[in-house]
UniProtKB/Swiss-Prot annotation:
It comes from the Bacteria. This is Ribose-5-phosphate isomerase A. The active site is at residue 103. It comes from Alcanivorax borkumensis (strain ATCC 700651 / DSM 11573 / NCIMB 13689 / SK2). It catalyses: aldehydo-D-ribose 5-phosphate = D-ribulose 5-phosphate.
Length: 218
């Protein structure tokens, strides 16, 4: 089954977690885009959304779905987003699209985090996908040296700036045997805004679109 079909299928399955009359958080990326398209069918049943990126906000508005500033919202009942990798503990690597900081903020606000993926994103151990780290531009070289000292191989994502005006270092070959510990260690490096490990705040529910046509939940 085509990967886009799987993404569409799992995105539509996430609609059952959308409470009527609430403001919900919406993620960024290809699978999240399928969720936005599906959410448009329910737009009259929700109060609105909070977007984790400018691109997501634009797509929501194109569907006529209201987008609120997170600063105007006290809490979110649910946040729906994809992942680049997810393990059996529902810990994730996110940020392939560069929206990791805003995604992490919206996830922190949400009572329930629903992660939607196709089966190719499930892993036993995180780290085959390079770990994105958002960095203040002037700290790029300093942070890169610190990452090398931790055993990583940082690669500057050239020509890309986040919605916050920062740069991304994609780090290969990090030992992610303890995701919670590494998430904290990386965030303690001066100049790092945040990293793409979602371990301290993992997903509450993972929905997986399988090639068989089934959507599994764990």
């Amino acid at each position: 089954m085509d990967q886009d079909v799987l993404k569409k299928q799992v995105a539509e399955a996430a609609l059952r977690f959308v409470p009527e009359g609430d403001i919900i958080g919406v993620g960024t990326g290809s699978t999240a885009n399928f969720f936005i398209d599906a959410l448009a069918t329910l737009k009259d049943r929700i109060k609105g959304t909070v977007a984790s990126s400018e691109a997501t906000a634009e797509r929501l508005k194109q569907h006529g779905i209201e987008v609120f500033s997170l600063n105007d919202v006290g809490s979110l009942s649910v946040y729906v987003d994809g992942a680049d990798e997810v393990n059996q503990h529902r810990e994730m690597i996110k940020g392939g699209g560069g929206a990791l900081t805003r995604e992490k903020i919206v996830a922190a606000m949400a009572k329930e985090f629903i992660c939607i993926v196709d089966g190719s994103k499930q892993v036993n151990r995180l780290g085959a996908f390079p770990l994105p780290i958002e960095v203040i531009p002037m700290a790029r070289s300093y942070v890169a040296r610190k990452l090398v000292a931790l055993g990583g191989q940082p690669q500057y994502r050239e020509g890309f700036l986040t919605d916050n005006g920062n740069i991304i270092l994609d780090v290969h070959n990090l030992d992610i045997s303890n995701p919670i510990e590494l998430e904290t260690t990386l965030n303690n490096i001066v100049g790092v805004v945040t990293n793409g490990l979602f371990a301290k705040r993992p997903a509450d529910i993972v929905l997986v679109g399988e090639k068989s046509g089934a959507v599994n939940q764990y």
